[in-house]
UniProtKB/Swiss-Prot annotation:
It comes from Xylella fastidiosa (strain Temecula1 / ATCC 700964). The gene is rplV. This protein binds specifically to 23S rRNA; its binding is stimulated by other ribosomal proteins, e.g. L4, L17, and L20. It is important during the early stages of 50S assembly. It makes multiple contacts with different domains of the 23S rRNA in the assembled 50S subunit and ribosome. This is Large ribosomal subunit protein uL22. Gene3D superfamilies: Ribosomal protein L22/L17 (3.90.470.10). One of its GO terms (molecular function) is rRNA binding. Coiled coil: none annotated. CDD domains: Ribosomal_L22. The keyword Ion transport does not apply. Belongs to the universal ribosomal protein uL22 family.
Amino acid sequence: MEASAILRGARVSPQKARLVAAQVRGLSADSAVNLLRFSSKKAACLIKKVVESAIANAENNHGSNIDDLRINTIIVDEGRMLKRFMARAKGRSSRIVKRSSHITVVVGPAK
């Protein structure tokens, strides 16, 4: 049985989060958590929490063993954008877009 976990509105750019997500896609659950634990990227900490939550959901809801789980899908979608303005020269301003992400992780039995 598959179990999922979703983190909405994570304050990390989707482009940066997708780089980390690509590293753990298809790995076994315990090796993915181990890889994310030692990564220095901000997105790795957020994705690690979602993966651990999905593993806990699988153990609690379906009685799965962590050794039998792998990451079936991991999706990083765009979240809400915060628009800010920064003062520039000669009285002008530029718009700054602070992006956020929705991170979805689905774990299931290894095939």
